[in-house]
Each structure stands twice: as structure tokens, then as C-alpha cells.
Amino acid sequence: MTKEELIEFEQQIADLFNAKQIKSPIHLYHGNEDFIMEVFKEIDIENDWVCCTWRNHYQALLKGIPQNKILDSIVEGKSMVLNFYDHKFISSSIVGGIPSIAAGIAYANKLSNNNSRVWCWVGDMSAETGAFHEAYKFSLYNELPITFVIEDNKKSVCTPTSDAWKRETPYYLNQEYCGEIIRQQNLYYYQYSNDKYPHAGAGKRIQF
């Protein structure tokens, strides 16, 4: 799966949504392709779990799930809740809903000693929730095989995260961001800007 193929897939979903072929909300990626592909170089596609939020198309594609299978689920209205258990891929549309699930899977993996790692994506504002903090802290104290990948687009819907919390550097980072993926124990972090699509939808249809 190339960068161009990722972008093309999201454009296809945007076109279908604007043509009213997709009836449920969608959340599209753009601008993070290089970072997410770099992270996936470390993922064991067959053995590791990938856990996501409502914005999850790129992860599903990079996990090796067939495009037609992903497309069918999105057209059926499941864009925000793509779940393919046979591919060890799950997602949740609840803010702060996926970190504790991911930590639970990682805990089970540790008890089973099956060498499977969990990779859990969350946004920058979701990473400010108590649910994330508890899951992240639990993973550290129990030395769980999990990496939380925080994608920072600097906003929650239309609210700048730094304005909401009155700080530029998030509490969970031990260094300032310099343009590359920050790698800490059980946590990766990178920033990107999506100037192509709005928070939800594809820019032409009113949703909620």
C-alpha cells in the first residue's frame, strides 16, 4: 500500500459520501501518510492488534484488510466502527473508548505470552481524557506490550487543543516536538495538518 493509494482511497470515500452513497458520518485522513506508514513498518501485520478511533481507514488498509471489504463496511455505514476481528483490527467511535480496550487486549497478550503487541491510535484531545490517562498509566506500571500512537492535528473538532488546556507541549511528552515521531515507553507521538477534509464528512454535505 503506497502513500498515493491511501490518498486515492480516501478520495473515493469522499466522492461516495458527497454523492449520497454513504449515509452515515465519515472521518477522513489527509496529511499524515508518511508518519502512519513509518509506524506500520514496526507492526507485525499478522500477529499484532491495531485499535483505532472513528478515523481509521488508513490503519485498516495498512493492516492488510482487503479494500473491497473495507469499502463495503463504509458504504454500509460502519466507517466509524470498522471491526475486523479476523484481522485483529478494532475501532470505537466513543471518545476515550478505545484505550482501555486496547490495554485489556495487551494485558491478555502478556498473560498468554503470545508475543503479540497492541498498537492503539488516539487523537490529541482524546489523549487528554481520563480514560486515556488511566489506560496509559496501567500499561506502564504493568509493562504491557502496547504502543499508544497519538496523532496531533492541534484540534478537537474545531477547538485548538492548546487553547483548551493552556499549554503547547502535552503532559505525556518528555520533550518538545521537532517534526519527527517522538518515541517514548509505550507511546508514539506526531503532528500533522489535514487541510483537505473537515473534521467530519467531505466538505459538501451537512451531517449532524
Task: Say what each PLM segment does.
Residues 2-3, 17, 113-116, 148-151:
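A short alpha-helix capping/helix-coil boundary motif
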Residues 142-208:
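Thiamine diphosphate
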